[in-house]
Amino acid sequence: MVLVGKTGSGKSATGNTILGEKKFTSSSSGSSVTSSCSQKYAHRFGCKIVIVDTPGIFDTKQSNNKIQQEIFKCVGITAPGPHAFILVLSLTRYTEEEKRTVEHFVKYFGDKIYGYFIVLFTRKDDLDDEGKSLSDHIKTVPGELQLFLKKCGGRVIAFNNKLKGEEQDAQVSALLSMISENIKHNKGDCYTNEMYHEAEALIQKREKEIIQKAKIEREKEQQDIEKRLDKEYKSKLVEKTDKFNETQTQLEEIIRAIHAQEKSENVMDTKMKGSEKQVQSTQSMGMKRDELKQKLDGLLKNKMNLEKKQEEDRREMERKAQEKFKIQQRNARNVVREEVEQEKGFFSRAWSHLKSYFS
């Protein structure tokens, strides 16, 4: 949602109320805190809420070009389009600056924007102190504001930004319900126009660039994984394999020797007993064979455990690398939004394409 209004109307404080935490810098003075479009978000009520706080367009003494760039930034941050434009007003009066702000947005966004506007009055606590309802207050506002409310379909709400806890949640929930109902009324569509369509196409192109860069980084990381595993495990595996092969060779030699001994004994007269020395030799070789078998089993087990550990490390490294890549994919849109917000990278390219809409 996009917060619109003059300096001192309570836009930033309202944004903090909606998000449930202080993310925008707000001030009770008349000085401008928000000098440039900025976005903040939070997860509340089972959904992700993204808010764009806009500067007071006609009371910050900015050049016309700067004003146009700020509106463009609003487009870039909220593409493919916002679900609501919130006109934040003080209860006290509907000023010339606020009228011109609305006119400026209608000029660049078209009359269709009225279908997405919601008027939000701040300082509801003043109404409560006076024992007045919001309906009572609306009857006293200037005719121009009443006409604007009519064009907006009568969508109006009041906030007390001093509330905390459940009371704060209740008024935010009421606003979100109003927005949800209006989304249904608009057949599930967010606000959009030709300018938004072109901005979205440029943003998607930039997203692809970001994702492609992430893919290249992912491939390089895969190569780095293999190098790290090779460095950590190759020498250990070679050493264990050599020991295994050496022991296996010794075992095979012992087995051949035993077979030769047994063959020699078989050709002797079966009635003759072998010498005590021959018996001891056969027993000794048998014990050596059993020792080597046991050693071979241990070496094989150690080698398999090391290979298993190597594979586990590989899978874990690849899992982390893949998760990092997925996060980069999911965050590609946020990266583009930040570039627009901070007037870096993509901002200049997109502004050069879209500034004709503001001429």
Where are these regions (language model features)?
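C-terminal non-catalytic interaction/localization modules
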Residues: 1-51, 58-66, 77, 96-116, ...
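Glycine-rich, N-terminal phosphate-binding loop of Rossmann-like dinucleotide-binding domains
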Residues: 89-90
